[in-house]
């Protein structure tokens, strides 16, 4: 019986405490700005059902408020508690009335730097961030300053650094605070030799990927860049490059060890897709990310749709002196086209030399050979071409698969001459630009411009793949794919020697990953610029930022065209740049 009575009393006390807690609300008055924000952060650990009017809880709140104020230089606040009766159908309110009091001011910030830090510009720059004498103490500034010293040491290779002394002195009677820091960075480490384990690629190729030389001063960004460059080659499944500290304490020369594992030798990918331009499409590819110890790689692919069937390959050969940014590319393939008034069988082979520059620009010179049998309208021809060319391009983006900012630029010149065996003389100049900009997160603008010019004395021998046609998803919407060009006397498309198209599209973020779009496209594909024939299409669309890239659905109509009146729709998936 006594035990039962005790249990009953305990149960009643718990129920009573819970009932009181559920009927009391805590309120803090007298603070604003950063003081209020910091105190609220200290009190955030208190749950609403923990609030009670008893002395123990008040002491807990008192401690939390003092800690929050102390961090910002207020060491002597006055805190008074009042318990207000509940309003009608409300709860009791426990009010903490706070007077912050006189703040503690910075009286001095003595920082002594030893070792390499005495002359290192990054450490010296930190000294300028110390608070001015007479400003209110903020303990966060002191803690962050110490963290910054440590951060510079780790970033720049002062791995023996230590605080000989670090003290924040408070003289409450004078309401002053004093920094007293004595920091020895020690000697800066330098990069030593780099060794690799597990690589199937020759060591000299890997050594030429290093963004630093042996003996250079250590920088953590250089180590991160080496990891990035090794991954960017596509040769490895995993890459880890780490310092070997145990071998460097005496000499301050830091060797690095890279542990890599080869990527799978063969990768096969298949896919089924649909685009309005070519309809349903089946794709397959076979990739060999490395074929030998020189890092050569091979990609073959095929794409089959009703109007186009393509089989091609690409063989990449990195150069020893700069394997990531400089390489040869051998490309070739076969393409069969039966679209509108074009029938073509084309076999191509090209050898290109690439330079990928640190600025983001890519440069290339190439030598192409092609053999084409084609019928364009009523004209049938067979041509063999052998022509060099140059190309420069750059793509930049920020914001993931559906960029908030970005641009893509590509400029090329190709030249063919019968003097070296081509069947036709020509010069081809092309420029393609895409720009993406976003304002205030919800307003997205996509602008496109394409220009092309063919100069030749025998246009009928130029293969359709080199001629210009407009119309379609990435050209002038409202018109069918490649349906705009000059026509012959029978009304068949001939292709054009001049191209100019542009597009302006505005997208608005309706909700989440969904965007609405309105656009206008305009341009022409002509052979005589004196006979301008601009076409314009306009429409609306929907965009979904899917995990694999933007999915689009557009509806467009021609504007002011007496021959074209129908509604065209476009479905697509893929990058906009």
UniProtKB/Swiss-Prot annotation:
Coiled coil: none
The POTRA domain, residue ranges: 187-263
Transmembrane segments: 265-276, 279-288, 297-306, 309-317, 327-336, 347-356, 361-370, 387-395, 406-415, 428-437, 444-453, 500-508, 514-523, 536-545, 549-557, 568-577
Major subcellular location class: membrane
Gene Ontology CC annotation, any one: cell outer membrane
InterPro entries: Bac_surfAg_D15 (IPR000184), BamA/TamA_POTRA (IPR010827), D15-like (IPR039910), POTRA (IPR034746), TamA_POTRA_Dom_1 (IPR035243)
Record PROSITE patterns: POTRA (PS51779)
Keyword flag Transmembrane: yes
Phenotype when the gene is knocked out: Significantly reduced survival in human serum, probably due to complement-mediated killing.
Localization per record: Cell outer membrane
GO biological process, one term: protein secretion
Keyword terms, alphabetized: Cell outer membrane, Membrane, Signal, Transmembrane, Transmembrane beta strand, Virulence
Signal peptide: 1-21
Pfam families from the UniProt entry: Omp85, POTRA, POTRA_TamA_1
Protein family membership: Belongs to the TamA family.
Function according to Swiss-Prot or TrEMBL: Component of the translocation and assembly module (TAM), which facilitates the insertion and assembly of specific beta-barrel proteins into the outer membrane.
Self-association state and partner proteins as the record states: Interacts with TamB to form the translocation and assembly module (TAM).
Name used for this protein in its record: Translocation and assembly module subunit TamA
Organism, as annotated: Salmonella typhimurium (strain SL1344)
Source organism phylogeny: Bacteria, Pseudomonadati, Pseudomonadota, Gammaproteobacteria, Enterobacterales
Name of the gene encoding the protein in the UniProt record: tamA
């Amino acid at each position: 019986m006594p035990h039962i009575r005790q249990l009953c009393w305990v149960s009643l006390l718990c129920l009573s405490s819970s009932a009181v807690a559920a009927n009391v609300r805590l309120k803090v008055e007298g603070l604003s700005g950063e003081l209020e924000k910091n105190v609220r952060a200290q009190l955030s650990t208190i749950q609403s059902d923990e609030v009670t009017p008893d002395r123990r809880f008040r002491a807990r709140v008192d401690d939390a408020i003092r800690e929050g104020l102390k961090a910002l230089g207020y060491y002597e606040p006055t805190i008074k508690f009042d318990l207000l009766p509940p309003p009608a159908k409300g709860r009791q309110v426990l009010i903490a009335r706070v007077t912050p009091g006189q703040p503690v001011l910075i009286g001095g910030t003595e920082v002594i730097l030893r070792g390499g830090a005495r002359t290192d510009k990054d450490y010296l720059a930190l000294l300028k961030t110390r608070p001015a004498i007479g400003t209110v103490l903020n303990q966060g500034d002191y803690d962050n300053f110490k963290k910054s010293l440590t951060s510079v040491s780790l970033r720049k290779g002062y791995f023996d650094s230590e605080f000989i002394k670090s003290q924040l002195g408070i003289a409450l009677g004078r309401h002053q605070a004093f920094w007293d820091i004595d920091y020895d960075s020690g000697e800066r480490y330098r990069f030593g030799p780099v060794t690799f384990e597990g690589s199937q690629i020759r060591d000299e190729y890997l050594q030429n990927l290093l963004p630093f030389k042996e003996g250079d001063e250590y920088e953590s960004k250089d180590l991160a860049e080496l990891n990035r460059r090794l991954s960017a080659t596509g040769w490895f499944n995993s890459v880890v490059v780490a310092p070997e500290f145990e071998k460097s304490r005496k000499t301050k020369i830091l060797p690095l060890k890279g542990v890599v594992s080869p990527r799978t030798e063969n990768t096969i990918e298949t896919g089924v897709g649909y685009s309005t331009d070519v309809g349903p499409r089946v794709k397959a590819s076979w990739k060999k990310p490395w074929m030998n110890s020189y890092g050569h790689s091979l990609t073959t692919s095929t794409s089959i749709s009703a109007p186009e069937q393509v089989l091609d390959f690409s063989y990449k050969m990195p150069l020893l002196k700069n394997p990531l940014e400089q390489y040869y590319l051998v490309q070739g393939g076969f393409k069969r086209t039966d679209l509108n008034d074009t029938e073509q069988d084309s076999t191509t082979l090209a050898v290109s030399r690439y330079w990928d520059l640190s600025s983001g620009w890519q440069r290339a010179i190439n030598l192409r050979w092609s053999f084409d049998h084609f019928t364009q309208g009523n004209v049938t021809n067979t041509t063999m071409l052998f022509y060099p060319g140059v190309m420069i391009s750059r793509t930049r983006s920020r914001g993931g698969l559906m960029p908030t900012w970005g641009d893509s630029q590509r400029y090329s010149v190709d030249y063919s001459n019968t003097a070296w065996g081509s069947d036709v003389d020509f010069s081809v100049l092309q420029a393609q630009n895409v720009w993406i900009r976003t304002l205030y997160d919800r307003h997205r603008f996509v602008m496109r411009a394409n220009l092309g010019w063919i100069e030749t004395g025998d246009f009928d021998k130029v293969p359709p793949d080199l001629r210009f046609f407009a119309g379609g998803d990435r050209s002038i919407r409202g018109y069918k794919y490649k349906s705009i060009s000059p026509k012959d006397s029978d009304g068949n498309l001939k292709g054009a020697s001049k191209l100019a198209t542009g597009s302006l599209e505005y997208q608005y973020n309706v909700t989440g990953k969904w965007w609405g779009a309105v656009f206008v496209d305009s341009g022409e594909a002509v052979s005589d610029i004196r006979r301008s024939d601009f076409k314009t299409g306009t429409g609306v669309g929907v965009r979904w930022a899917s995990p694999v890239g933007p999915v689009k659905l557009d509806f467009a109509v021609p504007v002011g065209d007496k021959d074209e009146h129908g509604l065209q729709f476009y479905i697509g998936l893929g990058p906009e740049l």
